Amino acid sequence: MLELSHVTFRYAEGLPDILKDISLSFDKGEFVAITGRNGCGKTTVTRLLTGLEKPASGQILYHGKDVTREEPSERSRFIGYVFQQPDRQMFMPTVREEIAFGPYHQGKRGAELEEAVARAMQDTDTEALAEEYPRILSRGDQQRVAIASALAMDTEY
């Protein structure tokens, strides 16, 4: 289970709370939609879960373990994330290398890495884009590459 437990978030001390005493939990395999108006904190919740932001108070728990102060690179072992603007995260020379970047940094090599990339590309119908430069793709194709990158990491959440 992945949880936000009584989390309060503000961008800096002295500024108003963006989120106040929020508690949410996510079970493995559960699909959750966080909806609301612009600026209501949807992206902030995902940034807190992934470690891209730190709460002012409260905890982020992974199977009961406090991971609040862990870096995003540590949390990427169990949390996958697709950015709203995927072109901001793409910097590899080919789609295949872009998709392989995360699993490679998780320690996957050789056949294990190739299998993760091939499966993610098949699941997102991006095989034909394998040798393309990600930043020149259409926004829709960039989004599919970003989804493939998250899938290739084979995270729990």
Predicted segments with their positions:
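The feature captures the beta-strand-to-loop junction immediately N-terminal to the Walker
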Residues: 35-37
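Conserved ABC transporter NBD signature motif
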Residues: 58-66, 75
